[in-house]
């Protein structure tokens, strides 16, 4: 079997002389036309610290591909900075960018008939976007994470970007002055790399390591450390070998691999966004996965790591303590991981973990021992009830009041909600409802980090609940329930809630309930009318037209056949 199984379609034979002529212009020589052509999907950008160091990694990937006997072709893909667009109209483009990234990588790799792809990403949507494309195309591939940022520091306290969001709430509540707010702002993000807690980017990179689509230890490395660049070059070598062996994503991204990823996400206390993204990746890989699967795994996997946003440490601390391989070995020792799942190296998960210790070092407390976990069960709970018949996603660890029944405060946008919080109009016992922020209704399913951080900063984190058909940042914690489906824009019950209604959030019973009679609910449903589309042209209009429910991953290519 030729190594250039796909690309020979454009490099072999007399008829391909014009194709080869153009390839010669970009550096191909006679001997290169039989080598596998490998795309390097480069998400470098200076709009965000998450991606500003990626170009250097892409160059190391190019070197690695060449050394291993492949022919690299570098191309760009996009990124949105979730942190910078947070709380603005621009955030509507964040989840949209996941699918734009997927479509762009698929378009280039298939348009150029590449033999494989090494994708490098940093900010939140880079990871799932790349993996959706990889699963769709089913050509040999590996993902390289751009790396995590190192923590900032102020008055001896580690900072992340979430510290700055929470400082806004503290300032508005009169807890800190403008000088301290400015100091936190200046020190929160000290250099290159993705947001430093177990937020969405680090959650998804950890998931990909657990799935076997990234190299061991690579998901928790700091962006600015030399080992990150070395790991990138090694990834290129591994990919070229995978092309020779024709190890395909369909052999790796299996039901077992995704279950392994979910187990690791629970153990590290990962982001709610992982639920949405793994559903979408599973769909692209033709793997059956539902919200109920997350709940089944959550019930049996403990939270082992003390990581921000609700914990103490950042991802670089996790790396120093033993990283994802140590967490995986602990899960494996307790039969909570599938050891026979294949990885891009050609080895199984079990084989890769053979020499990894099964207990965390005693001189650290980032990774807890099995008999003393942070929490006995996972933190990402699936809630259902008349407010979410398809389901909703809640973070339930670190919540002092796992059951709350309160007065609904209803807002039809994130901005209106944030204004009320900062103005002191939200009281203890309220349940905030933020709707028309779902995949179709936003459109784009914005993250509610600004309101939730303002709640924490105001000292109301364990005193109010917040539910939304939008999403939450990986930096969010507290009594929050997102991904409520069906969403308001399609007539879900969340659209029918009125100011002053009583709502129950019960994490123990996995319940999200609007406390009105079925008859009253049906009356409201009969008079509800859908809103006119907010956007009628451009990418947001297309997205709103195509996107599916968050309960199935908010994918844009469902039901097209």
Curated annotation (Swiss-Prot):
InterPro entries cross-referenced by the UniProt entry? DHAD_IlvD/Edd, Dihydro-acid_dehy_C, DihydroxyA_deHydtase, DiOHA_6PGluconate_deHydtase_CS, ILV_EDD_C, ILV_EDD_N, IlvD/EDD_N
EC number(s) of the enzyme? 4.2.1.9
Reaction(s) catalysed by this chain, per the record, are: (2R)-2,3-dihydroxy-3-methylbutanoate = 3-methyl-2-oxobutanoate + H2O; (2R,3R)-2,3-dihydroxy-3-methylpentanoate = (S)-3-methyl-2-oxopentanoate + H2O
Which cofactors does it use?
Answer: [2Fe-2S] cluster; Mg(2+)
Chain positions recorded as Mg(2+) binding sites: 82, 124-125, 447
Cite the annotated pathway. Answer: Amino-acid biosynthesis; L-isoleucine biosynthesis; L-isoleucine from 2-oxobutanoate: step 3/4; Amino-acid biosynthesis; L-valine biosynthesis; L-valine from pyruvate: step 3/4
Which UniProt keywords are listed? 2Fe-2S, Amino-acid biosynthesis, Branched-chain amino acid biosynthesis, Iron, Iron-sulfur, Lyase, Magnesium, Metal-binding
Q: Which residues bind [2Fe-2S] cluster?
A: 50, 123, 195
- One GO MF term attached to the UniProt entry: dihydroxy-acid dehydratase activity
Write out the GO biological process terms.
isoleucine biosynthetic process; L-valine biosynthetic process
Coiled-coil ranges per UniProt:
none
The record describes how the cofactor is bound as: Binds 1 [2Fe-2S] cluster per subunit. This cluster acts as a Lewis acid cofactor.
Superkingdom of the source? Answer: Bacteria
Q: Where is the active site?
A: 473 (proton acceptor)
Residue numbers bearing the N6-carboxylysine modification: 125
Subunit structure as annotated in this protein's UniProt entry: Homodimer.
* HAMAP family referenced in this protein's UniProt entry, alphabetically: IlvD
Function, as annotated, reads: Functions in the biosynthesis of branched-chain amino acids. Catalyzes the dehydration of (2R,3R)-2,3-dihydroxy-3-methylpentanoate (2,3-dihydroxy-3-methylvalerate) into 2-oxo-3-methylpentanoate (2-oxo-3-methylvalerate) and of (2R)-2,3-dihydroxy-3-methylbutanoate (2,3-dihydroxyisovalerate) into 2-oxo-3-methylbutanoate (2-oxoisovalerate), the penultimate precursor to L-isoleucine and L-valine, respectively.
Family listed: Belongs to the IlvD/Edd family.
**What is the name listed in the Swiss-Prot or TrEMBL entry for this protein?**
Dihydroxy-acid dehydratase
Query: Which species does the entry assign this protein to?
Result: Trichodesmium erythraeum (strain IMS101)
Taxonomy of origin reads: Bacteria, Bacillati, Cyanobacteriota, Cyanophyceae, Oscillatoriophycideae
